Amino acid sequence: MMEYIDISILNPAEYNPRLLTNEAQEDLKKSIKELGIIKPIIIRQSDKRIMAGHQRTKTMKLLGYTHVPAFILDGVNSTDEVRFNQLHNYAECELSEIQPEINVSLPKGTEGFYTVSNKDISILSKGGNNSRVVDLTKMILRYGQFANAICDHTGKVIISTVYAKTVKLLGMDLLVYVLPEGKEEIALKYFSKEYGVFE
């Protein structure tokens, strides 16, 4: 379940391998200014350590945010911490033709975070990435849900489609972020960028 957490109590993980270039930092600032925080970070319950979302947290601090949306997970081992980071970053780069096509039913005028019941999630085409579904399934069953999907105002999922498919197949409800009308291209532009370089 997503919660809003005081950003000042969060601790960065030592293993985070990505460094932000100045250009990427500016792009990330622009995306947050234009879209807001549409993707929660992942933190560890025991010590509030960030497992995924380091660069966005850093940028939110620079922009003056005091609270951040986060999934809080308990009992995560060190191997799975790194795995969460990888899965989280993969969702930023999954914009390809082999993705499943997913629609969700939304009340008219819905914007921002919204929980969609499982019966209101429709898989229109299965796409590929069955191995990714298996990976996501293992992590969700072990720790609970840790991500959201992003959809346009009509309910078409445009980012994190594989995650949405996995949640549907597991019979669970799905947290989505519903973009305001006309913001789809902006979101796709920013999510197709690489925010950070690996050391």
Where are these regions (language model features)?
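Short, charged/polar connector segments at secondary-structure boundaries
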Residues: 1-178, 187, 191-198
